[in-house]
Curated annotation (Swiss-Prot):
The modification Histidine amide is found at residue 35. The keyword Disulfide bond applies. Residues 1-22 form the signal peptide. Neuropeptide ligand for the CCHamide-1 receptor CCHa1-R. Neuromessenger mediating signaling between neuronal cells of the circadian clock network involved in regulation of sleep latency (the time required to fall asleep), amount of sleep and depth of sleep (arousability). Together with PDF, involved in regulating intensity and periodicity of daytime activity. In subsets of clock neurons modulates the rhythmic expression of PDP1 and PDF, and together with PDF modulates the rhythmic expression of circadian protein PER/period, but not TIM/timeless. This is Neuropeptide CCHamide-1. It comes from the Eukaryota. One of its GO terms (cellular component) is extracellular space. Keywords: Amidation, Disulfide bond, Glycoprotein, Hormone, Neuropeptide, Secreted, Signal. Glycans are attached at residue 174. Disulfide bonds join 24-31. InterPro entries: CCHa1/2. It is found in: Secreted. One of its GO terms (biological process) is neuropeptide signaling pathway.
Length: 182
């Protein structure tokens, strides 16, 4: 009897574990997004999407301060004046500290990328709008039998007809003038 209860419990536990494996419940989240009830906390989502800035800037500044401190101690061990050691420390710190920490640069780059992305999105919207207008104009032109579109051959034929008609009219004027004097 106890064997059947134990085996049934094990089957249920294995089945539950199989259902949980690979889902968000495996990681301790309580998201029911697929069912539309609730999703994970906003702080958790933001932490996943926006990782902390790179600590390279902080590490490099700490390393430079450590090296400057060692240089300062070496200068004091050489029995130099305090003025000389201060000048060395100041010169070293001015040359070694970066102008902007990489963490700040990465924030600026991400903002620039975001702004650049918005600019590209706006340009693409304008391009799609202009393309849609052009396609609409072309479709309207085809629907009316080609009217509304520029046709170079038809335009040159029209100009040729006008030039020939002007020539015929000019010849008629000149010819009719001679006949009147008769």
């Amino acid at each position: 009897m106890w064997y059947s209860k134990c085996s049934w419990t094990l089957v249920v536990l294995v089945a539950l574990f199989a259902l949980v494996t690979g889902s968000c419940l495996e990681y301790g989240h309580s998201c029911w997004g697929a069912h539309g009830k609730r999703s994970g906390g906003k702080a958790v989502i933001d932490a996943k999407q926006h990782p902390l800035p790179n600590s390279y800037g902080l590490d490099s500044v700490v390393e430079q301060l450590y090296n400057n401190n060692n240089n300062n101690q070496n200068n004091q061990d050489d029995d130099n004046n305090d003025d000389d050691s201060n000048r060395n420390t100041n010169a070293n710190s001015a040359n070694n500290i970066p102008l902007a920490a990489p963490a700040i640069i990465s924030r600026r780059e991400s903002e620039d990328r975001r702004i650049g992305g918005l600019k590209w999105a706006q340009l693409m919207r304008q391009h799609r709008y202009q393309l849609r207008q052009l396609q609409d104009q072309q479709q309207q032109g085809r629907g009316r039998g080609g009217q509304g579109q520029y046709d170079a051959a038809a335009e040159s034929w029209r100009k040729l007809q006008q030039a020939l008609q002007a020539q015929i009219d000019a010849d008629n004027e000149n010819y009719s003038g001679y006949e009147l004097t008769k």
